[in-house]
Amino acid sequence: MANISAALVKELRERTAAGMMDCKKALEEAAGDIELAIENMRKSGQAKAAKKAGRIAAEGVIFARTEGNVAVMIELNCETDFVSKDAGFLAMGQKIVEIAATQKIADVDALKAADFGNGESVELTITNLIAKIGENMNLRRVMLVEGDNLGTYVHGSRIGVITKLAGGSDELAKDLAMHVAANSPQFVKPEDVSAEVVAKEREIQIDIAINSGKPKEIAEKMVEGRMKKFTGEVSLTGQPFVKDPSMTVAELLKKEGADVVSFTRFEVGEGIEKQETDFAAEVAAQIAAAQKA
């Protein structure tokens, strides 16, 4: 029998999200060959999908698609980066975003209830893949935008953007979608920054100035200039254009005779609290449980 190291068990666990004892057993059966162990584990993934539903799905892929004057983006989650690259998972995501675009579905529940094209609903198709692969998955959100000048951009499968322009071109819309993906603006224009956000930032900047030794009156005057810079930094039109930093996005739009109506940016797992596990503590807990059995 091959000598299975703890490091090898840990690597297999990280790549498959399977339990420590399951990983050790799989490696023993594969004589220490981790790739063979992964293949065997995937083939034997017969666990019921219901057992996976409570696990946190914070990895995944953003899928985007344009159909005529409709642009759609979805976030499909899974538990591990390993599964986010699985061919079956990717094919399913592409089909789901196609369904959303062609049928103009903008609601997650409605999309889950839609026919996948195999006589089963989208939700049931996801459930079947959960049972086959052996980890939780979730269709988390969908965004649909209609308009004439739409741009979509997906960066590294993890960040997706839809932009909608008045005027301009689809190419400009795509360039701006790329910019939003890279620079994460929170608002379209500086004047769109909410009073609440401005007030909070002003308070922070005044405290910083006072703590540096400035009198309150001088600190407040200093902050006015900083606030203008702040609203520009957090708004799309106030930022230097990613493909030509010598001009702002506002200057680019003026040159192209266009305006930004809206943008939506998805990033995989944002807002989902990932569960962090102490590997050594988990090993100790599982050994203790095994000794009690």
From Swiss-Prot:
One of its GO terms (molecular function) is translation elongation factor activity. InterPro entries: EF-Ts_dimer_sf, Transl_elong_EFTs/EF1B, Transl_elong_EFTs/EF1B_dimer, Transl_elong_Ts_CS, UBA-like_sf. PROSITE patterns: EF_TS_2 (PS01127). It is found in: Cytoplasm. It holds the Pfam family EF_TS. GO terms for cellular component: cytoplasm. Residues 80-83 are annotated as: Involved in Mg(2+) ion dislocation from EF-Tu. Its main location: cytoplasm. Keywords: Cytoplasm, Elongation factor, Protein biosynthesis. Associates with the EF-Tu.GDP complex and induces the exchange of GDP to GTP. It remains bound to the aminoacyl-tRNA.EF-Tu.GTP complex up to the GTP hydrolysis stage on the ribosome. HAMAP family: EF_Ts (MF_00050). Belongs to the EF-Ts family. This is Elongation factor Ts. It comes from Aeromonas hydrophila subsp. hydrophila (strain ATCC 7966 / DSM 30187 / BCRC 13018 / CCUG 14551 / JCM 1027 / KCTC 2358 / NCIMB 9240 / NCTC 8049). The lineage of its organism: Bacteria, Pseudomonadati, Pseudomonadota, Gammaproteobacteria, Aeromonadales.
